[in-house]
Structures are given as C-alpha cells and as structure tokens.
Amino acid sequence: DPLFIFQLTHSGELSHPDFSKRVCIKPLAGFGGEVIGEDEIMAIMDKFVTAAKIAYDSGADGVDLKFCHGYLGSQILRPYNDGDWKYGGPWEKRRQFAFDMVERVRKAIPDKDFLIGSKISMWEGFPGGQGSAGPDTAIIDLTEPLDLAKGIEERGASFVIQSAGSPSITLALSQPDKAVPDQVYLHHTFQKALRDELKPETVVIGSAYSVFNDGNNKLQARNKEENTTFFWGNKNIKDGVVDMIALG
C-alpha cells in the first residue's frame, strides 16, 4: 500500500522574504539573512515536533526531516558552521542537532508504526558544505554524512533518502539534467556508501534517477537501452546499491 510521508523543513538562508524571514546561523556569501542564535533554533525545533504531531494526527505514515539541499538542517550540519555554540563547531556538536530532532520527534510520537527518516545531502559540492572535509574546502569526505545516517538510525530512523548538492548553489549536482548528466554517477557512489554502512532493515532510497528517463540523455559510453531509469533502478536495487529509488 502507498505510504503518505510529510517532508518537514525550514528554509533558513533560502527563505523567500515574501513568505518567511530569511535567517542564518553564519552568513554565507550571496545568501545571508538575519543571524539567529540558540534560543531561536530551539523554538524552531519545537515547531518541527509540533508539525510531526500534526502529521501523525492527520493520519500520515511518517515524516522526512530534511537535512539536505541547503535548508536550515544543512546549514547547521555543514563544516561551515564553525561558531562556538550549542550546535556549532566540532562535528560532535553539529550532528547533535539532527540527533536531538529525531529523538524529540520519536518521544512525542512513540508509535513505532510512524516512520521517521531523513533526506541527506551527502556532498553539497562547495567549500564548507555537507560532506566536505572542512569549513574552507570542497574536498569530499563522507565521514560526517555517514556518521549522521548511522546516528539517526540508532535513534529510530527507519529510512534515509540519499541526495546531494544544494539546488541554489550546485544545481547540476543536486538535479543532474539531460544536457549535463554526468554527476548522476556520484549519486550511485553515495547510495552504495550508505547501504554498506546502515543496517539491512534500514531502507536506503536513491535519488537522481529521473535524468536517465527513457535513455534520451547525453551520457556517453553506454547503449541507450542500458541508460534508462528502468535499467539503472533495477540494476542498483539488484546489486545492493539501494533498496528503492525516488522519482520526481
């Protein structure tokens, strides 16, 4: 049967002023917003928990806590968030934001049939982004995103949706398109890293398969019939790269 899962997020520095106030924890060049502190973050976390309870009471099957795509969760988890505060600086402090969020949602909704999971940007593709080796480098280091996935799994998450990039900054990484699709293979690499790290019962869902479509793309060195969404989705599920794929 189909499952109905709400995505919960706060846009942070990506908020549109016509909809909500743009805020940040450390101004990022080209974005920024009003700098907020620990009290405001704790209030936002309260609202996440309230939203999850509303979803549960409405009959939803679960929630996806978005730690991806440059939203507030990403902004806190990034190495770029190197300030000295409750959720800033060393990884052990930054990751605690996500761990606390999952624990608080599960405590508020103890029903084990209510699914909790997260969409994670494994590598945002710019200096200091998620999956980078430090606050001023873009070199890939999956230590933190893999530890994040394991940590939320230990706290009750039953699925992880793999993603990458930040659409406002690295769109071609986040959403490979037919014109420049090559970065889609990075997604497969990130998916396999997650699948190898997590428990067999934790569902890993892979992203970026839509670019393959019916084989009409500009990926080279493959026969068209081996370059489709159907082919790669089935292959990667069979090969143990992912358990499911996301389309959209």
Language model features: what each stretch is:
Residues D1-L247:
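Flavin-dependent oxidoreductase catalytic cores
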